[in-house]
Structure formats: C-alpha cells, structure tokens
C-alpha cells in the first residue's frame, strides 16, 4: 500500500504530558486521541494499550520510553509525547522533553504534587519549555476542599520553577473521558484542554534558516528499505537526496537521506520542529545510535572537552546533599544522549548545592556539540545540576 503524503495545512506544534508516575499521563494521552478521533473522522484513536506498548510497560502499567501520537484541533496539528513518570526512566523523559515546545503537567487531585512533579517541572524548564498547562486529574476521586488546596500548591510550584503565575488549570477525569467518549459531560475536560492549548501555547519560532540538525532518538531497520533514524529536527530543512553527516560517539560519516516521513506519512521536506524518520543510504543499523546527530555537512563537530556554567540543585530541589570536588564523574545529558564526564574546578576547591559556577568537563566519548547548548547533569538516578556550554576546548 502506498503511503499518503503529509499535508501541511495547520501550524505544527510538539507537546507532551509530564508528571508523577500513576497520575494519569498515558490515560490522558489516550483520552485526547479518542476524543480527537470522534471530532475528526480522519484521526485514528489509540487506546491506552496502544500507547503503553512495550511488554514491560504493559506488565507494570507504566510508560518507559517516550511515545508519540498525533492529533489535530481546530487550529493546529499536534505531535504529542507521552513521557515516562517512573524514576528509573527519567532519562527517557529528558529525551521526550527535548522534543517539546510546551507541556501538560498532570497532577492527581487526590494526592497533589509529588517528588517527580517537581523533577519534571525542573527538567521542562531546563529543556527550554516556556509554557505549561496543568491538568488536575482524578477529580472524581478527590475531596472538593482538598482540590482547592492542591490548586494553590501546584500554582506555587509552577511559579517557583519559572513558569507564569497565570498558568491555566484544567480539571477533570482522564479515565472518565477515556471510558465514556460519547458522553459530552465526561469529555468536557478534554475539549477545554485542547481549546486552552490552542489559545495559550505560543507557536514557537522555528530555526528553518539555519543548517539542518536532528538529534537521533531511535534507530530502526526496515527490511528491503534500510536504516531509519528518528528524532526531532532541531533546525533547518531536510529533503530527499540531501547529503548529511552522522556526528558524535563514533567516526563522523557521510550518507544521503533517501526518505523523510512523519507518522508513517511521506513528507516533501522535513522542517525544524517536525518529529521525523529519515531513511539513510548505505548505513547499517549497528553503525548508528541514539545520541548521535544527523547534520548538514561541515556544520557541527564532535568534542570531548568544554567549559560550562552550571547551577547545582539544592537538597530541597532534589539535588546533592554534599559538595563535589575536582574529579567528580556524573552523567551529562545532551539532547538525546547521556555520557560520563570528569569535572575540573578552576580556582575553587569545591561546589556546594545551590552554587552557580563555571567548570571544565572532559567527556569519555566525543559528542556533537556547539556553544550555548544546554544540558542536565545526573548522578545516581537524580538530576543534580543543569548547565550551558560557554566554550568548546577540544
């Protein structure tokens, strides 16, 4: 069957659901998908099981890797990432957040904000997300007086992490909407959420004029066609027949893009902001991996050593309890990759939680990087600092 061509009739935006495990992120994603399929006859409804689609996820009922679905509202085309809330999988949440323009923060009305709610807000802020909408879920299970307290608490938290004080809150039950898609009362919260997304989220300015760059999120082998790398186009435009370079982790190599697709539809060209799959000529699946980037030839180089300015989270923000010294070896998260690096302090003996400081980092492998790129620093399963590259040293 020939694939259909993706029609660009509405502005495209990437959103995602973030929040604590079991607060209902995947249920909300499914409820949106089902609601949009009722309103728009072309849309495909995805059930909870379709979104949580890895065997381990079905067994545990939690999302491990970020999942993508698409839907349309009256005014926009959305790509929606369902981000994992489970602590072990927060690094996949970082990959998901790196692809979002805006986020929907889920908070269960019956339990309020929890540790991961804070960590996700911090990561969203570090990944450059400017606006969020709060979806207060499980309203049917919560004491009405408690709901008001949760609202106040959540808005305080949202402001603390640098999001606007007038962040909208939509209240409802994602499970109710998913289970009763034909009941207007049950789906009212989904309708309100989508309308709020259209009106409150600003369409991002896309770097279409800059050289092409995509950070690889996943790699697949399609029999008879070759190797496909997926990810979000960070900047520029890509067309079939274009020569590109695969940079980072391994030796830089050239290849040609022989196909561009989004959500199983053919794209005439991929643009900044699109989540795409690129078919690569003559590249074996084992030669490409998550964390590399695909870029216009000669526009980005791999490096190991750089100077950066970082902010170390306090104990209250979920960071370290003790200072660190030269020789500290945490993981550095760039775009879709995490790599161990060694920290050197210059003119400073130690770094305390809560400090803003400049450091020199030497990574154990070469990563495609440029100035001003932001990164997260993690250790032992938690985010301990966030930073930005000031200068590339080697």
Curated annotation (Swiss-Prot):
Residues reported in the UniProt entry to bind GTP: 19-26, 82-86, 137-140
Major subcellular site: cytoplasm
Location of the region described as G4 in the Swiss-Prot/TrEMBL record: 137-140
Annotated InterPro entries: EF-Tu_GTP-bd (IPR041709), EF-Tu_GTPase (IPR050055), EFTu-like_2 (IPR004161), EFTU_2 (IPR033720), G_TR_CS (IPR031157), P-loop_NTPase (IPR027417), Small_GTP-bd (IPR005225), T_Tr_GTP-bd_dom (IPR000795)
Localization of this protein: Cytoplasm
Domain of life: Bacteria
Stretches the record annotates as G3: 82-85
EC id: 3.6.5.3
Signal peptide: none
Keyword match rRNA-binding: no
Start and end residues of each tr-type G domain: 10-205
Keyword Hydrolase assigned: yes
A Gene Ontology cellular-component term: cytoplasm
Region (G5): 173-175
Pfam families, alphabetized: GTP_EFTU, GTP_EFTU_D2, GTP_EFTU_D3
Biological role stated in the UniProt entry: GTP hydrolase that promotes the GTP-dependent binding of aminoacyl-tRNA to the A-site of ribosomes during protein biosynthesis.
Name of the protein in its database record: Elongation factor Tu
Organism, as annotated: Borrelia hermsii (strain HS1 / DAH)
């Amino acid at each position: 069957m020939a694939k259909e061509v993706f029609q660009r009739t509405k502005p495209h935006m990437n959103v995602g659901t973030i929040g604590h495990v079991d607060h209902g992120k995947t249920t909300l994603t499914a409820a949106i998908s089902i609601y949009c399929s009722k309103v728009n006859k072309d849309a495909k409804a995805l059930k909870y099981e379709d979104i949580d689609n890895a065997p381990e996820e079905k067994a545990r009922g939690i999302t491990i890797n970020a999942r993508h679905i698409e839907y349309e509202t009256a005014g926009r085309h959305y790509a929606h990432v369902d981000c994992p809330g489970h602590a072990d999988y927060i690094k996949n949440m970082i990959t998901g957040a790196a692809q979002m323009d805006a986020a929907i923060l889920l908070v269960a009305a019956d339990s309020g904000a929890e540790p991961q709610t804070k960590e996700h807000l911090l990561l969203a802020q570090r990944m450059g997300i400017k606006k969020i909408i709060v979806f207060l879920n499980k309203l049917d299970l919560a004491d009405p007086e408690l709901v008001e307290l949760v609202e106040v608490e959540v808005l305080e938290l949202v402001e603390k992490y640098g999001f606007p004080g007038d962040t909208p809150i939509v209240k409802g039950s994602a499970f109710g909407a998913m289970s009763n898609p034909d009941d207007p009362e049950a789906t009212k919260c989904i309708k309100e959420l989508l309308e709020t997304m259209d009106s409150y989220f600003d369409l991002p300015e896309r770097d279409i004029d800059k050289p092409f760059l995509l950070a690889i999120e996943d790699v697949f082998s399609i029999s008879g066609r070759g190797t496909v790398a997926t990810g979000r186009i960070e900047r520029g435009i890509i067309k079939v027949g274009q020569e590109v370079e695969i940079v980072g982790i391994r030796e830089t190599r050239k290849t040609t893009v022989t196909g561009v697709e989004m959500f199983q539809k053919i794209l005439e060209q991929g643009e900044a902001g699109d989540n795409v799959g690129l078919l690569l000529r003559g590249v074996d699946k084992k030669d490409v991996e998550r964390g590399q980037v695909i870029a216009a030839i000669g526009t980005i180089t791999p490096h190991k050593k750089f100077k950066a300015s970082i902010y170390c989270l306090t104990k209250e923000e979920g960071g370290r309890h003790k200072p660190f010294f030269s020789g500290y070896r945490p993981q550095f998260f760039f775009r879709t990759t995490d790599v161990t690096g060694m920290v050197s302090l210059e003119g400073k003996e130690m770094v305390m939680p809560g400090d803003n400081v400049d450091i020199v980092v030497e990574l154990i492998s070469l990563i495609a990087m440029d100035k001003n790129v932001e990164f997260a620093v993690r250790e032992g399963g938690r985010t301990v600092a966030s930073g930005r590259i000031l200068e590339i040293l080697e």
